[in-house]
């Protein structure tokens, strides 16, 4: 550190469970004579700190099995108190339905309420391998959301 005019340390306070991390970093910086900055990142929030609202669009072409709408609603309601990223939720819903139904084609699109002006609308699709639906899935993925909605027209 003697090769530099000034050395400064930065710690990001992002709501970590162990505040001891920040305390130890502060003490080490003080011992070394290093200026220490703590940047509060709590504005990012934790995964489960804020409720998320979404409209989930599910379209599928069945093969031999269909899902009853009441069962599907109960399954989707199980996500009410589930803390996870939007993308993970949509991917899990899609994979669960593929495993359950073995459909020819399936797509799941989550339209989540924007936070801070940023909209995250994850999309999952599946086409049964070796069928024309495999090509349909690829085509739909490439054409998906070419003209996304604006935040003010939801």
Swiss-Prot record:
Pathway: tRNA modification; tRNA-queuosine biosynthesis. The active site is at residue 52. Belongs to the GTP cyclohydrolase I family. QueF type 1 subfamily. Its EC number is 1.7.1.13. Keywords: Cytoplasm, NADP, Oxidoreductase, Queuosine biosynthesis. PANTHER family: NADPH-DEPENDENT 7-CYANO-7-DEAZAGUANINE REDUCTASE. Gene3D superfamilies: 3.30.1130.10. Substrate binds at residues 67-69, 86-87. One of its GO terms (cellular component) is cytoplasm. GO terms for molecular function: preQ1 synthase activity. Its main location: cytoplasm. This is Putative NADPH-dependent 7-cyano-7-deazaguanine reductase. It is an enzyme of class 1 (oxidoreductase). Pfam families: QueC (PF06508), QueF (PF14489). GO terms for biological process: queuosine biosynthetic process; tRNA modification. HAMAP family: QueF_type1. InterPro entries: GTP-CH-I_C/QueF, NADPH_dep_7-cyano-7-deazaG_red, QueC, QueF, QueF_type1. Catalyzes the NADPH-dependent reduction of 7-cyano-7-deazaguanine (preQ0) to 7-aminomethyl-7-deazaguanine (preQ1). It catalyses: 7-aminomethyl-7-carbaguanine + 2 NADP(+) = 7-cyano-7-deazaguanine + 2 NADPH + 3 H(+). It comes from Streptococcus pneumoniae serotype 4 (strain ATCC BAA-334 / TIGR4). It comes from the Bacteria. It is found in: Cytoplasm.
């Amino acid at each position: 550190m003697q090769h530099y005019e000034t050395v400064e340390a930065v710690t990001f306070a992002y709501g970590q469970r162990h505040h001891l991390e920040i305390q130890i970093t502060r003490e080490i910086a003080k011992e070394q004579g290093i200026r220490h900055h703590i940047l509060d990142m709590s504005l990012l929030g934790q995964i489960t700190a804020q409720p998320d609202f979404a409209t989930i669009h599910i379209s599928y072409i069945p093969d031999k099995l269909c899902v009853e709408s009441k069962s599907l609603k109960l399954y989707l309601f199980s996500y009410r108190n589930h803390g996870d990223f939007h993308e993970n939720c949509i991917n899990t819903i899609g994979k669960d339905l593929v495993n359950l139904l073995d459909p020819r084609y399936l797509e799941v699109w989550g339209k989540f309420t924007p936070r801070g002006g940023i909209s995250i609308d994850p999309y999952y699709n599946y086409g049964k391998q070796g069928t024309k639906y495999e090509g349909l899935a690829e085509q739909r993925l490439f054409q998906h959301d070419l003209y996304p909605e604006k935040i003010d027209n939801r």
